[in-house]
Amino acid sequence: MSNIIKQLEQEQMKQDVPSFRPGDSVEVKVWVVEGAKKRLQAFEGVVIAIRNRGLHSAFTVRKVSNGEGVERVFQTHSPVVDSINVKRRGAVRRAKLYYLRERSGKAARIKERLNSK
Protein backbone atom coordinates (compact mmCIF):
# COMPACT_ATOMS: atom_id res chain seq x y z
CA MET A 1 0.00 0.00 0.00
CA SER A 2 2.67 2.53 0.96
CA ASN A 3 4.69 1.70 -2.16
CA ILE A 4 1.75 2.78 -4.31
CA ILE A 5 1.46 6.07 -2.41
CA LYS A 6 5.21 6.70 -2.71
CA GLN A 7 5.06 6.03 -6.45
CA LEU A 8 2.12 8.42 -6.94
CA GLU A 9 3.85 11.13 -4.89
CA GLN A 10 7.09 10.65 -6.85
CA GLU A 11 5.21 11.21 -10.13
CA GLN A 12 3.74 14.49 -8.84
CA MET A 13 7.03 15.90 -7.53
CA LYS A 14 8.83 18.54 -9.60
CA GLN A 15 12.26 17.57 -10.87
CA ASP A 16 13.56 21.08 -11.64
CA VAL A 17 13.68 22.44 -8.05
CA PRO A 18 17.08 24.10 -7.44
CA SER A 19 19.13 23.39 -4.34
CA PHE A 20 18.79 26.17 -1.76
CA ARG A 21 19.23 26.54 1.99
CA PRO A 22 18.06 28.92 4.73
CA GLY A 23 19.78 32.28 4.33
CA ASP A 24 19.70 32.15 0.53
CA SER A 25 17.99 34.96 -1.37
CA VAL A 26 15.51 33.53 -3.85
CA GLU A 27 13.01 34.79 -6.40
CA VAL A 28 9.85 32.69 -6.57
CA LYS A 29 7.56 33.16 -9.57
CA VAL A 30 3.96 32.29 -8.75
CA TRP A 31 0.90 32.02 -10.98
CA VAL A 32 -1.81 34.48 -9.85
CA VAL A 33 -5.38 34.32 -11.17
CA GLU A 34 -7.26 37.64 -11.24
CA GLY A 35 -10.70 37.19 -12.73
CA ALA A 36 -10.21 35.62 -16.15
CA LYS A 37 -6.53 36.64 -16.39
CA LYS A 38 -3.59 34.52 -15.30
CA ARG A 39 -0.18 36.11 -14.77
CA LEU A 40 3.18 35.49 -13.11
CA GLN A 41 4.03 37.36 -9.91
CA ALA A 42 7.56 37.44 -8.48
CA PHE A 43 8.26 37.28 -4.74
CA GLU A 44 11.90 37.91 -3.82
CA GLY A 45 13.32 37.52 -0.33
CA VAL A 46 15.39 35.45 2.10
CA VAL A 47 14.56 31.82 2.84
CA ILE A 48 14.06 31.64 6.62
CA ALA A 49 12.79 28.06 6.92
CA ILE A 50 12.59 24.84 4.92
CA ARG A 51 10.28 21.92 5.70
CA ASN A 52 11.36 18.76 3.85
CA ARG A 53 8.46 16.30 3.68
CA GLY A 54 8.67 14.80 0.20
CA LEU A 55 5.70 15.93 -1.87
CA HIS A 56 4.49 18.09 1.05
CA SER A 57 7.75 20.08 1.32
CA ALA A 58 7.48 23.81 1.92
CA PHE A 59 9.72 26.82 2.45
CA THR A 60 9.18 30.27 3.95
CA VAL A 61 10.47 33.43 2.25
CA ARG A 62 10.70 36.79 4.04
CA LYS A 63 11.11 40.24 2.55
CA VAL A 64 10.63 43.81 3.76
CA SER A 65 8.18 45.79 1.62
CA ASN A 66 7.61 49.48 2.38
CA GLY A 67 9.09 49.03 5.85
CA GLU A 68 6.73 46.15 6.65
CA GLY A 69 7.97 42.56 6.93
CA VAL A 70 6.16 40.11 4.65
CA GLU A 71 6.50 36.34 4.92
CA ARG A 72 5.06 33.84 2.50
CA VAL A 73 5.04 30.05 2.71
CA PHE A 74 5.36 28.20 -0.61
CA GLN A 75 4.70 24.52 -1.25
CA THR A 76 7.82 23.38 -3.12
CA HIS A 77 6.06 21.04 -5.56
CA SER A 78 2.88 23.09 -6.05
CA PRO A 79 1.69 23.78 -9.62
CA VAL A 80 1.12 27.40 -8.52
CA VAL A 81 4.91 27.85 -8.14
CA ASP A 82 6.31 28.36 -11.65
CA SER A 83 10.02 28.72 -10.90
CA ILE A 84 12.50 29.24 -8.08
CA ASN A 85 15.64 31.23 -8.87
CA VAL A 86 18.51 31.47 -6.34
CA LYS A 87 19.87 35.03 -6.46
CA ARG A 88 22.44 34.90 -3.64
CA ARG A 89 23.81 32.28 -1.24
CA GLY A 90 23.78 33.21 2.44
CA ALA A 91 26.14 32.00 5.20
CA VAL A 92 24.10 31.13 8.29
CA ARG A 93 24.50 28.59 11.09
CA ARG A 94 20.84 27.91 11.84
CA ALA A 95 18.14 25.85 10.14
CA LYS A 96 15.36 28.30 11.05
CA LEU A 97 16.06 32.03 10.84
CA TYR A 98 13.06 33.26 12.84
CA TYR A 99 15.34 35.69 14.71
CA LEU A 100 15.31 37.88 11.57
CA ARG A 101 11.71 38.84 12.43
CA GLU A 102 12.94 41.00 15.32
CA ARG A 103 15.80 42.56 13.37
CA SER A 104 15.60 45.42 10.91
CA GLY A 105 17.96 47.33 8.66
CA LYS A 106 21.63 46.44 8.80
CA ALA A 107 21.11 44.02 11.70
CA ALA A 108 19.05 41.78 9.41
CA ARG A 109 21.83 41.41 6.83
CA ILE A 110 23.25 37.97 6.01
CA LYS A 111 26.83 37.41 4.85
CA GLU A 112 27.31 35.84 1.44
CA ARG A 113 28.47 32.22 1.31
CA LEU A 114 31.55 32.03 -0.89
CA ASN A 115 31.88 28.27 -1.38
CA SER A 116 28.67 26.69 -2.59
CA LYS A 117 28.32 23.21 -1.14
Swiss-Prot record:
PROSITE patterns: RIBOSOMAL_L19 (PS01015). Belongs to the bacterial ribosomal protein bL19 family. It comes from the Bacteria. GO terms for cellular component: cytosolic large ribosomal subunit. Keywords: Ribonucleoprotein, Ribosomal protein. Gene3D superfamilies: 2.30.30.790. GO terms for molecular function: structural constituent of ribosome. The keyword Ribosomal protein applies. It comes from Photorhabdus laumondii subsp. laumondii (strain DSM 15139 / CIP 105565 / TT01) (Photorhabdus luminescens subsp. laumondii). It holds the Pfam family Ribosomal_L19. This protein is located at the 30S-50S ribosomal subunit interface and may play a role in the structure and function of the aminoacyl-tRNA binding site. GO terms for biological process: translation. The keyword Ribosomal protein applies. The gene is rplS. This is Large ribosomal subunit protein bL19.
